[in-house]
């Protein structure tokens, strides 16, 4: 039978595994299953058809799309489908399918037909036999040929799979059939039983009956060579199995491989375990079973098949390794000479715990036991009954202990019996015989299982077979003595007739086996009441002779030298005792050796008594820790019997460490290809309370934001692909699985998808995974799903979601996903692979969802099974679907494998519209837009159920997308960021998703639905800008209408807006191109663009917001030549683009959204602000408002975002007075810009006036966002320059001015460092600054300047960068900045300039980079990490101030100047008033923030005054717009007030979500605090922590740096919502710069104020945190330890990383660095972009830097980027400002977009900032541009992830 089994089972498996390789038996002649013709016959045909079909496929593609995709798709498909070698993804997918498809359904097209006669009969009976091991006589039944099954080969195979061979062969005949009970978690017995009853190879097969088996057969491969058959079975250990090595480390058995080699002569098997350290196991500990021992049990028969592998496992949580001192077990060898007074000795034993007995205590033996018997105390508990005289037991049952009832008569005997310890075993006569041998009985008790002692329940463990004869000890059973009885499984009591002990001596370990012979109790003539039931003694059935007797073995380790006689006895008994699988003489470390046959009880009980049990002596020599191994017992072990074998493994004490925290994630497999997007699973370390761990399931799964829409939030059961060696420990708080599923960790902070949409959607999404949604959608239409099967859905380029589902009920129920996993692979390849299966039904089904949501089913002709499966052979529609499956389409494409009634594999290919439900991630809008663009017409958008009312966002997106190549637009936009890109497309044309977003956005932003939509659509960053824009527009137009009905009107509006935006985008594109060409005259260019934007804004008042958002995208395309460079910045600094046209502004938000919550919170606030400002601004945007909006946007986007950090103030002012301030700002729209510039610049002062609407943010930004803001300002500038290059030039001018202003402040501050380079920058910056900056910023600046000194470098660098950007925009500044960039930028400029691009693309990163500049500049000042703080504050503030201020002042100035000097002056006055207000607020905030430092900073930058003029000049263009803006501002103020309330409510929600996220990240946050966010950073970081976990730990060393880093992270993460992000980051940085208290207090106050006004601010920190959490989580191990690079820990380290990672991960790294090294990282990122600068910075820290890369592909749905998200985890050892060495681990998520795809627009957008930098620093430009593109893209993408 064993042979049969082995052969039978493998054969099917073999068929499955090697159906194509091995000769298959003739398939059943199923009518519906024709045999596939040989593939060869079709190969040529297929080859020919492949080309033709591909051509045909392309003919079906829209000409425009075809034009764009022809080459790419051809190459992609050819590459994907053409490569002969299966890729890792293919292998994984196919293996996954193989493993999850029913084992017997795989490759078995030749299954015997149902009509095929089946030999032999009752399969059920036979299977039952197998199950029960009751094959008494079947041992030799047809050993060689498979046992005929009742018909079902499957059943027979199942039998084999589920039964040990020896059971099958009837080896178990002597075993008594037992009813197996399911192993309860923690139930050692159950587990042991499990292993005992099942061979390992069977364990994996998961038959329905044996679900609990630890091993799951994943694959079985049979090789037949000659007569040698080698079967390799690969088992997936589910639940997790673990092996403990000699050191005590527990290793997960990732896979158990059983190699069976059978030949005529030999049949051998060996187990290979693929293990990995348990601490690397990211599995629920309750699922972990420790394989306590593997033993090969060889039957006596020569037949090898008699051997069985016994895996003894124990639930991990049940393992309580207790180091027991040997003294506890020391035998008291010569305790009492076997001599004279047995009774006295008996009393001794009775009164003392054995372990307390010493040989010298004979005299005092009668003394009461020294120690109290404490329950649970091992020593005292061990011998519980020893402590009482036996007589005390008389007539009463001792409940908790051995349940022993002394016989009424013979009690005296017992007491006299020296074996009082053994009362249970012998009766008085026995006592007399053994009179002097106390030790024997002592040993007996020592060997009693503790629970037998401790529990009164009768649990004899085996069913005793009675054996005739007296026990080997020859002790007669005394009837008068208490009768000890064993209870068998049937509950029968068997009196112990004799007890014998056999000693096994091996090594220095002595084992005793107690053999109890029993006699049925009823034969004792005594009532059971007098019986002590012995529990937990191993029964050895002696088959020989009378089966009626069973020997009970107590196997124990002698208390050392327990009596020679006993040893002899033992040796004697050895022959009789059942042979243990383990050698009787165990080598010292041999786990198998000592077999404690103590009965074990369920782990839950074990926990209580483990102490006692463990106390059993282990080998005296080394085993201090006892590993209890449950030795498998024969299956016959009755279920009821609790008898367990505890195997004590001797492990030298010290060696074994059991870490209970076994939840660790293994990094997503970095398969070298961007499959990094697979879900990260986080398991938190959980202290496992004893006994309850198994109940707890902590699984965290972060889904990339990109995958959010389709990825199931809940943990994927599937194991992480083998081969992923790196493990990360995720220090996420765990929460119950249920809550996880319910709310995806509520805030979704842990879910990367979080950024995608507000928490509400996220929570919903977590409840239904994409696969579930797909299945639900498919199942909703009858006829599609008819059977459980496997769902394969393309999640994105190179990634597949594989889900195994079953249909509940009769197939009518909803599909239930049993297992879902993301694997890397290409759907087309997998489909081709699947199609090659011989059992594929040729009649497939193609399910296509039309835009209306109707599923259209078409028959799908599948290639003949035997054919090559080339694409040409496929149905053209399937080909098209496959092409989409490559990730180029937004549609959800996939394949469903189901089984037909005939047993064939029915394939259903489906292409579903992106889900537009709230659950869908923003991507769906993008997808919709993308699909519309793919089709070349936007009509599909009309079909959306909701339409944004005149949603400009969609238009801009459309126009942006359309202005770009359709592909470019699509590709371009989505790659921006999973969030941003999605937001872009969404905002622009992918409004479908926005509805959800709107749903959230509306509440969040409290903006019109359109804004909401935009928010959703641009939710990432775009959402922010879009929402802001839309909110602004929506508010302006009709916030009410938009919020109420973001749905339909928005979409229509979006469509119209898209068209308008397309036209505008095209015109803008031309303008931008011209402007870019005009680069030297950016102002002119900017004017046209701004004018165009203004017009567009005026034209698309509504559209503009979207447009603003979109323009960023479109702008990028428009300004592709130059703006693309700039635009990427613009995108991140969307607000700049917003200036350009709200478009760019929105993308900033897009980046923010990655913060998810941040976006929402920030966005709401931003939106409020923006609604106030933006609403005001949108109008200004249309005219002067163009710039005003730009500023407003910038203000909202930048300053507003700046306000976010300080929003409490700024927003407080802005919120309460925000409308007024907004109006004022709008009124002073030019000033608004100016003010914004001023505000940010003089974050303390100007921000207030400007931030009357968003004063605090500027303050914080001024301080915190100094670096950020330069990033932001640069971003704004860049955005303006890039996003609205045409516009940008003016904006840039205006921004340049702000930058100049800021730079003057920052420059002056920074000038000392960057003087040579900075002066020029200063000048450009100065002009914008004076008007407002001088007024407002200087005060603020001054406060910041002190912190800024470090900040100077950053700020200067940033200002320089801004200048550089300005210079880029403004040729003159560009020159200087270039110089500066070249010179200082390497440190400051590069960071700033780079940061700019980064900030805009990964502006956050860049902003942090400026911080790095600060850090670098601060490197010089590196000694003062506090300065970094200051830097962060200040650079942030200056940058922020100058950036936004500069931009805004520029814009404001532009607007103002263009409007009129008077208007400008008036605006300035208003601004001044606002500034005064802001200053007042700022002072409050500044009280926390170093206002004086800012002031000093500003004062230090005397040139700030100079900036103002420039700003006015810049403002000139928007004169009329500004006035318009004012009028609109007034109106918008009202709308804003409304929106404010809405937003407030939304923000509260967001805040709540953020709080959840923060709480989720609380574990991280404390680290962040501990890490050295000593000041506020920890707090901010806590919020930022999630967003920038790295940030949190990144700047433990320097809060300033950290702030910078956070800023960087924020900025980068918020590249989309850079402004917001910057605002937040800056606020945070600012706050941090001020001091966490400032951040906390002002932020909190502001937040609360904002909350009152715009709730978001508070959320903002969370938001910051939140964004980082969802998309990517960087876990930072920030351990303060002296590091090599104490000086510039963050920056150098960051720089190095940046340098190293810059090219591919530059932005992400920037982000990461920003996050971690806030400052340093930003700089590095900047450096990344400009590696030259970074390396210097990096060089110091490299040595302390560790980098581990976790690659996540976050853009599953964004066809724009095939790139994967690369998560780089870097560890930096940095020295913080306080000299603490901080080990920072930063995880940078780099989204690598496919540069080839949309290098211009996509990369351009992202790279634009870099380009800007490069423009600033040409030297680095060309070389870094590519980096910049990739890096920036990565940044932008990763930023959302980071956030």
Curated annotation (Swiss-Prot):
Keywords: Actin-binding, Cell junction, Coiled coil, Phosphoprotein, Repeat. GO terms for molecular function: actin filament binding; RNA binding. It holds the Pfam family Xin. GO terms for biological process: actin filament organization; myoblast differentiation involved in skeletal muscle regeneration; negative regulation of protein binding; protein localization; satellite cell activation involved in skeletal muscle regeneration. Residues 564-577, 1357-1368 have a biased composition (Basic and acidic residues). Residues 23-39 have a biased composition (Pro residues). Xin repeats lie at residues 89-104, 121-136, 151-166, 186-201, 226-241, 264-279, 302-317, 340-355, 376-391, 436-451, 507-522, 545-560, 589-604, 621-636, 654-669, 691-706, 723-738. The modification Phosphoserine is found at residues 205, 208, 213, 295, 332. It is found in: Cell junction, Adherens junction; Cell junction, Desmosome. Residues 415-429 have a biased composition (Low complexity). Expressed in skeletal muscle at areas of Z-disk disruption in a longitudinal pattern spanning one or more sarcomeres (at protein level). Its main location: other. Residues 1462-1490 form a coiled coil. Belongs to the Xin family. Interacts (via N-terminus) with CTTN; the interaction promotes CTTN localization to intercalated disks in cardiomyocytes. Interacts with CTNNB1. Interacts with FLNC and VASP. Interacts with F-actin. Protects actin filaments from depolymerization. Required for correct cardiac intercalated disk ultrastructure via maintenance of cell-cell adhesion stability, and as a result maintains cardiac organ morphology, conductance and heart beat rhythm. Required for development of normal skeletal muscle morphology and muscle fiber type composition. Plays a role in regulating muscle satellite cell activation and survival, as a result promotes muscle fiber recovery from injury and fatigue. This is Xin actin-binding repeat-containing protein 1. It comes from Homo sapiens (Human). The gene is XIRP1.
């Amino acid at each position: 039978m064993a042979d049969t089994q082995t052969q039978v089972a493998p054969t099917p498996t073999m068929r499955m595994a090697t159906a194509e390789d091995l000769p298959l038996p003739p398939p059943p002649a199923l009518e519906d299953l024709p045999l596939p013709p040989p593939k060869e016959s079709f190969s040529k045909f297929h080859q020919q058809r492949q080309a033709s079909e591909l051509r045909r496929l392309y003919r079906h593609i829209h000409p425009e799309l075809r034009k764009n995709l022809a080459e790419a798709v051809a190459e992609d498909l050819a590459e994907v489908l053409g490569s002969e070698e299966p890729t890792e993804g293919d292998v994984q997918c196919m293996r996954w399918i193989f493993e999850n498809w029913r084992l017997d359904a795989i490759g078995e097209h030749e299954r015997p037909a149902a009509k095929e006669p089946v030999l032999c009969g009752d399969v059920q009976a036979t299977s039952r036999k197998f199950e029960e091991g009751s094959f008494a006589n079947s041992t030799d039944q047809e050993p060689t040929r498979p046992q005929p099954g009742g018909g079902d080969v499957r059943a027979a195979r199942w039998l084999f799979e589920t039964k040990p061979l020896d059971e099958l062969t009837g080896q178990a005949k002597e075993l008594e059939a037992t009813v197996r009970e399911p192993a309860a978690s923690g139930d050692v017995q159950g587990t042991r039983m499990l292993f005992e009853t099942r061979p390992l190879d069977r364990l994996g097969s998961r038959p329905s009956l044996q679900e609990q088996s630890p091993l799951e057969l994943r694959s079985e491969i049979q090789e037949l060579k000659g007569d040698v058959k080698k079967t390799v079975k690969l088992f997936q250990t589910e639940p997790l199995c673990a092996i403990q090595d000699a050191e005590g480390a527990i290793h997960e058995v990732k896979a158990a491989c059983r190699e069976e080699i059978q030949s005529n002569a030999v049949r051998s098997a060996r187990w290979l375990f693929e293990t990995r350290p348990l601490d690397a196991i990211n599995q629920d500990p309750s699922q972990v079973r420790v394989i306590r021992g593997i033993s090969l049990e060889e039957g006596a028969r020569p037949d090898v098949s008699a051997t069985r592998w016994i895996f003894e496992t124990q639930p991990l949580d049940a393992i309580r390794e207790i180091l027991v001192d040997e003294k506890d077990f020391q035998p008291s060898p010569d305790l009492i000479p076997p001599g004279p007074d047995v009774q006295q000795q008996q009393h001794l034993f009775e009164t003392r715990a054995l372990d307390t007995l010493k040989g010298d205590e004979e005299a005092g033996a009668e003394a009461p036991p020294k120690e109290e018997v404490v329950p649970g105390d091992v020593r005292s508990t061990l011998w519980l009954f020893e402590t009482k005289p036996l007589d005390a037991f008389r007539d009463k049952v001792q409940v908790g202990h051995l349940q022993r009832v002394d016989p009424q008569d013979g009690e005296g005997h017992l007491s006299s019996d020296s074996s009082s310890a053994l009362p249970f075993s012998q009766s008085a006569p026995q006592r007399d015989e053994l009179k002097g041998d106390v030790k024997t009985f002592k040993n007996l008790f020592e060997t009693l299982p503790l629970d037998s002692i401790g529990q009164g329940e009768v649990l004899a463990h085996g069913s005793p077979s009675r054996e005739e004869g007296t026990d080997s000890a020859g002790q007669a059973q005394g009837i008068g003595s208490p009768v000890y009885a064993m209870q068998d499984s049937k509950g029968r009591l068997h009196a112990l007739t004799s007890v014998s002990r056999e000693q096994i001596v091996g090594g220095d370990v002595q084992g005793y086996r107690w053999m109890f012979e029993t006699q049925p109790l009823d034969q004792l003539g005594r009532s059971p009441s007098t019986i002590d039931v012995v529990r937990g003694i191993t029964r050895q059935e002696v088959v020989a002779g009378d089966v009626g007797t069973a020997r009970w073995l107590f196997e124990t380790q002698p208390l050392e030298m327990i009596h020679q006689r006993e040893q002899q006895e033992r040796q004697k008994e050895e022959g009789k005792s059942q042979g243990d699988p383990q050698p009787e003489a165990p080598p010292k470390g041999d786990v198998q050796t000592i077999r404690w046959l103590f009965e074990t009880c369920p782990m839950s009980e074990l926990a209580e008594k483990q102490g006692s049990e463990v106390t059993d002596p282990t080998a005296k020599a080394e085993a201090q820790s006892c590993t209890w191994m449950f030795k498998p017992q024969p299956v016959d072990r009755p279920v009821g019997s609790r008898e367990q074998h505890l195997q004590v493994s001797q492990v030298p004490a010290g060696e074994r460490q059991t870490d209970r925290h076994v939840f660790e994630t293994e990094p997503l497999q970095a398969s070298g290809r961007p499959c990094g997007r697979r879900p990260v699973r986080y398991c938190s370390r959980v202290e496992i309370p004893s006994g309850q761990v198994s109940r707890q399931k902590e699984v965290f799964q972060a889904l990339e934001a990109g995958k959010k829409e389709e990825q199931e939030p809940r943990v994927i059961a599937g194991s992480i692909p083998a081969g992923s060696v790196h493990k990360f420990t995720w220090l996420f708080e765990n929460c119950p699985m249920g809550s996880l599923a319910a709310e995806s960790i509520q805030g979704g902070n842990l879910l990367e998808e979080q950024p995608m949409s507000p928490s509400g959607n996220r929570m919903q999404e977590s409840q239904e995974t994409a696969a579930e949604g797909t299945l639900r959608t498919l199942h909703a239409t009858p006829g599609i799903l008819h059977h459980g099967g496997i769902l394969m859905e393309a999640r994105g380029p190179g990634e597949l979601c594989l889900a195994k589902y079953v249909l509940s009920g009769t197939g009518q129920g909803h599909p239930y996903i049993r297992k879902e996993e993301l694997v890397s692979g290409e759907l087309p390849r997998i489909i081709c692979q699947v199609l090659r299966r011989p059992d594929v039904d040729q009649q497939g089904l193609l399910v296509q969802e039309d835009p209306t949501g109707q599923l259209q089913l078409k028959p799908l002709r599948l290639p003949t099974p035997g054919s090559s499966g080339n694409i040409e052979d496929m149905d053209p529609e399937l080909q098209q679907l496959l092409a989409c499956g490559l990730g180029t389409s937004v549609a959800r494409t996939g394949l469903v494998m189901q089984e037909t009634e005939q047993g064939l594999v029915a394939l259903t290919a489906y292409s579903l519209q992106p889900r537009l439900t709230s659950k869908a991630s923003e991507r769906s809008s993008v997808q919709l837009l993308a699909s519309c663009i793919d089709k070349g017409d936007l009509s599909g958008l009309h079909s959306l159920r909701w339409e944004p009312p005149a949603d400009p966002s969609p238009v801009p997106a459309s126009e942006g997308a359309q202005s770009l190549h359709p592909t470019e637009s699509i590709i371009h936009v989505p790659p921006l960021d999973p969030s941003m890109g999605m937001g872009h497309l969404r905002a622009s044309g992918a409004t479908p998703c926005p509805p959800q977003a709107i749903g959230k956005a509306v509440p969040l932003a409290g903006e019109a639905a359109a804004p909401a939509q935009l928010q959703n659509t641009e939710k990432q960053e775009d959402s922010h800008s879009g929402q802001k824009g839309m909110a602004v527009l929506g508010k302006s137009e009709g916030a009410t209408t938009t919020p109420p009905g973001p749905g339909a009107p928005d979409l229509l509006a979006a469509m119209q807006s898209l068209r308008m935006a397309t036209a505008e985008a095209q015109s803008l594109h031309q303008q931008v191109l011209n402007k870019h060409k005009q680069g030297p005259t950016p102002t002119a260019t900017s004017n046209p663009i701004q004018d165009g934007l203004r017009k567009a804004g005026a034209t698309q008042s509504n559209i503009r917001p979207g447009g603003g958002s979109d323009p960023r995208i479109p702008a990028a395309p428009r300004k592709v030549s130059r703006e693309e460079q700039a635009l990427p910045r613009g995108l991140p600094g969307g607000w700049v683009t917003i200036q350009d046209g709200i478009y760019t502004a929105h993308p900033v938000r897009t980046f923010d959204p990655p913060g998810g919550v941040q976006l929402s919170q920030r966005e709401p606030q931003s939106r409020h602000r923006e609604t106030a400002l933006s609403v005001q601004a949108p109008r200004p945007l249309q005219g002067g408002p163009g710039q005003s909006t730009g500023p407003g946007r910038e203000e909202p986007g930048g300053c507003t975002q700046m306000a976010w950090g300080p929003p409490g103030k700024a927003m407080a002012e802005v919120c309460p007075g925000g409308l007024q301030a907004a109006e004022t700002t709008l009124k002073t729209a030019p000033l608004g810009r100016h003010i914004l510039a001023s505000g940010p610049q003089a974050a303390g002062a100007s921000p207030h006036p400007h931030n009357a609407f968003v004063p605090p943010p500027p303050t914080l930004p001024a301080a915190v966002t100094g670096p950020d803001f330069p990033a932001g300002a640069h971003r704004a500038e860049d955005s303006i320059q890039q996003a609205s290059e045409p516009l940008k030039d003016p904006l840039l001018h205006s921004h340049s001015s702000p930058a100049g202003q800021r730079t003057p402040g920052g420059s002056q501050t920074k000038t000392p460092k960057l003087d040579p380079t900075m002066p020029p920058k200063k000048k450009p910056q100065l002009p914008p600054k004076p008007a407002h900056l001088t007024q407002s910023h200087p005060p603020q600046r001054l406060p910041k300047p002190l912190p800024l000194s470090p900040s100077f470098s950053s700020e200067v660098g940033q200002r320089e960068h801004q200048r550089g950007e300005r210079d880029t925009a403004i040729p003159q500044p560009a020159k200087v900045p270039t110089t500066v960039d070249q010179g200082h930028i390497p440190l400051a400029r590069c960071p700033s300039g780079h940061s700019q691009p980064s900030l805009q693309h990964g502006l956050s990163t860049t902003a942090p980079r400026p911080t790095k500049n600060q850090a670098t500049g601060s490197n010089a000042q590196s000694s003062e990490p506090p300065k970094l703080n200051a830097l962060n504050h200040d650079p942030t503030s200056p940058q922020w101030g100058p950036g936004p201020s500069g931009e805004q002042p520029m814009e404001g100035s532009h607007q103002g100047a263009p409007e009129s000097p008077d208007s400008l002056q008036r605006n300035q006055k208003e601004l001044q008033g606002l500034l005064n207000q802001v200053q007042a607020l700022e002072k409050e905030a500044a009280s926390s923030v170093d206002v004086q430092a800012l002031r000093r900073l500003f004062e230090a930058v005397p040139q700030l005054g100079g900036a103002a003029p420039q700003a006015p000049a810049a403002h000139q263009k928007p004169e009329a717009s500004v006035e318009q803006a004012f009028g609109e501002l007034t109106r918008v103020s009202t709308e804003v007030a409304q929106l404010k309330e809405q937003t407030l409510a939304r923000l509260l929600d967001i805040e709540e979500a953020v709080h959840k996220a923060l709480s989720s990240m609380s574990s991280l946050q404390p680290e962040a605090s501990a890490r050295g966010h000593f000041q506020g950073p920890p707090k901010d970081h806590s919020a930022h922590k999630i967003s920038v976990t790295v940030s949190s730990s990144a700047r433990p060393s320097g809060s300033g740096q950290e702030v910078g880093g956070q800023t960087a992270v924020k900025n980068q993460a918020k590249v989309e919502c850079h402004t917001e992000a910057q605002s937040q980051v800056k606020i945070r940085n600012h706050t941090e710069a001020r001091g966490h208290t400032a951040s906390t207090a002002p932020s909190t106050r502001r937040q609360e104020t904002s909350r009152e006004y715009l709730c978001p601010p508070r959320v903002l920190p969370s938001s910051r945190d939140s964004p980082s959490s969802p998309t990517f989580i960087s876990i930072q191990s920030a351990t303060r330890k002296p590091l090599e690079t104490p000086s510039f820990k963050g920056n150098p380290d960051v720089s190095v990383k940046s340098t190293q990672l810059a090219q591919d991960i530059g932005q992400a790294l920037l982000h990461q660095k920003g996050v971690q090294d806030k400052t340093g990282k930003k700089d590095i990122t900047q450096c990344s972009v400009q590696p030259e600068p970074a390396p210097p910075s990096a060089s110091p820290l490299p040595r302390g830097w560790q980098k581990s890369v976790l690659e996540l592909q976050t853009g599953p749905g964004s066809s724009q980027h095939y790139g994967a998200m690369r998560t780089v985890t870097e560890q930096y050892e940095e020295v913080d400002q306080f000299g603490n060495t901080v080990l920072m681990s930063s995880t940078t998520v780099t989204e690598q977009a496919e540069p080839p795809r949309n290098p211009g627009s996509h990369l351009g957008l992202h790279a634009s900032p870099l380009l800007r930098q490069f423009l600033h620093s040409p030297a680095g430009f060309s070389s870094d541009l590519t980096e910049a593109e990739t890096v920036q893209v990565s940044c932008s993408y990763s930023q959302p992830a980071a956030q």
